């Protein structure tokens, strides 16, 4: 049978399965593809194909993730599933697989477990906007009171970590029954996809956000002012617009007098484009790599923030020893390294390689940042950790 071509006309959403080990995340992922394949919305993908997830490198960290794609009548989805707990932690912190929403899988037989909590907390920290719950393995629970109890526990846990626990759709079903083609199993998968379609909001496209471009390089063209190059991260820049140069020094205002791409002049540059931008009246020495060009007022420089960080294990090429309070590595934001000091919470003496931790950072120079910004921690040029800004403190 010929493969159905995916329609790119539908809005696209990135999603992923999260939850405790052995609660059925991978079985559910397989079940979604198998049920949707019946209406031509997916290629049926077996459990073993998803479980044998390839390794990928993201910001110097090796992560195993499996990707499947499927579509409902309203949307096109890219779905990520990770084999191991450590892969989830790394994935969510590095943003290797960006999630616009998540499906939290909880076994009805066990109820919420330690990793259920940790994944909900991580989702909150890294800014996953919404999630839907799939209460799996209901075929193993005969007592309806017990099911109600588990549902209440899940709702309380979601509320505790700042999600709207009372509103979140909870779908009860069995991924195994869906894989076996049983009608009640398939019905639950269809209900789940309806909930995902309606409850997980459509993400704001990069081009609709305010203009931002990290500066990678600076050139001066004799008689034609200064050109900065980089890849536009978000928004659109038009010739003649005012922009700010933010980070490392005091914020400066300038005007874009030209946009170039592949040596051709354009009227505008947009998210995803690698461009050169001509700046009016800005001297070569006033701009440097590590700053950003941005829409005026849209982003501010900061030097103190809280972060959620994954610290590489020795086997991953990270440190061999733990670090303590006042550790001073380099923090790599977008295009440059800045030295910073780590302040651990009062109850934490040290952070071991392989851990994930929350702490405060004080940089020696301010960087243009907003909550959700990803960074790497480096020591002598090698990556020893990856993090995400969870709160700005100044």
Swiss-Prot record:
Residues 60-64 are annotated as: G2. GO terms for cellular component: cytoplasm. InterPro entries: EF-Tu_GTP-bd, EF-Tu_GTPase, EFTu-like_2, EFTU_2, G_TR_CS, P-loop_NTPase, Small_GTP-bd, T_Tr_GTP-bd_dom. Residues 19-26 are annotated as: G1. Residues 174-176 are annotated as: G5. It is found in: Cytoplasm. PROSITE patterns: G_TR_1, G_TR_2. Residues 10-204 form the tr-type G domain. The keyword Cell membrane does not apply. Residues 136-139 are annotated as: G4. Its EC number is 3.6.5.3. Pfam families: GTP_EFTU, GTP_EFTU_D2, GTP_EFTU_D3. GTP binds at residues 19-26, 81-85, 136-139. GO terms for molecular function: GTP binding; GTPase activity; guanosine tetraphosphate binding; translation elongation factor activity. Mg(2+) binds at residue 26. It catalyses: GTP + H2O = GDP + phosphate + H(+). Disulfide bonds: none annotated. Keywords: Cytoplasm, Elongation factor, GTP-binding, Hydrolase, Magnesium, Metal-binding, Nucleotide-binding, Protein biosynthesis. Belongs to the TRAFAC class translation factor GTPase superfamily. Classic translation factor GTPase family. EF-Tu/EF-1A subfamily. Monomer. GTP hydrolase that promotes the GTP-dependent binding of aminoacyl-tRNA to the A-site of ribosomes during protein biosynthesis. This is Elongation factor Tu. It comes from Rickettsia parkeri. The lineage of its organism: Bacteria, Pseudomonadati, Pseudomonadota, Alphaproteobacteria, Rickettsiales.
């Amino acid at each position: 049978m010929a493969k159905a071509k995916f329609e790119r006309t539908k809005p696209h959403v990135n999603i992923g399965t999260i939850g405790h080990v052995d609660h059925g995340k991978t079985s559910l992922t397989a079940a979604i593809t198998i049920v949707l394949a019946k209406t031509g919305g997916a290629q049926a993908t077996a459990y073993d194909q998803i479980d044998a997830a390839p390794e990928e490198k993201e910001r110097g960290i090796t992560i195993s993730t499996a990707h499947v794609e499927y579509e409902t009548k309203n949307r096109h989805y890219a779905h990520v599933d990770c084999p191991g707990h450590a892969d989830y932690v790394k994935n969510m912190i590095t943003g290797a697989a960006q999630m616009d929403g998540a499906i939290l899988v909880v076994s009805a037989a066990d109820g919420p477990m330690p990793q259920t909590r940790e994944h909900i907390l991580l989702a909150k920290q890294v800014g996953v906007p919404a999630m839907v719950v799939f209460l799996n393995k209901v075929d193993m629970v005969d007592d309806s009171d017990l099911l109600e109890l588990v549902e209440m526990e899940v709702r309380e846990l979601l509320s505790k970590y700042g999600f709207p626990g009372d509103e979140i759709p909870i779908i009860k079903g069995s991924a195994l029954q869906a894989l076996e083609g049983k009608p009640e199993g398939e019905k639950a998968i269809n209900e789940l996809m309806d909930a995902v379609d309606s409850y997980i909001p459509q993400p704001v496209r990069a081009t609709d956000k305010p203009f931002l471009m990290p500066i990678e390089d600076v050139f001066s063209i004799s008689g034609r002012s200064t050109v900065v190059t980089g890849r536009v991260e978000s928004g659109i820049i038009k010739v003649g617009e005012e922009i700010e140069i933010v980070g490392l020094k005091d914020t400066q205002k300038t005007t874009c007098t030209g946009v170039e791409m592949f040596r051709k002049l354009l009227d505008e540059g947009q998210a995803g484009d690698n461009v050169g931008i001509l700046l009016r009246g800005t001297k070569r020495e006033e701009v440097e790599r590590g700053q950003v060009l941005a829409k005026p007022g849209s982003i501010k420089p900061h030097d103190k923030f809280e972060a959620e960080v994954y610290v590489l294990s020795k086997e991953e090429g990270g440190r061999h020893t733990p670090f303590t309070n006042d550790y001073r590595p380099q923090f790599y934001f977008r295009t440059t390294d800045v030295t910073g000091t780590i302040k651990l919470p009062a109850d934490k003496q040290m952070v071991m390689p392989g851990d994930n931790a929350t702490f405060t950072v004080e940089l020696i120079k301010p960087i243009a940042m907003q909550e959700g910004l990803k960074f790497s921690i480096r020591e002598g040029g090698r990556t020893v950790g990856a993090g995400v800004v969870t709160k700005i403190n100044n």
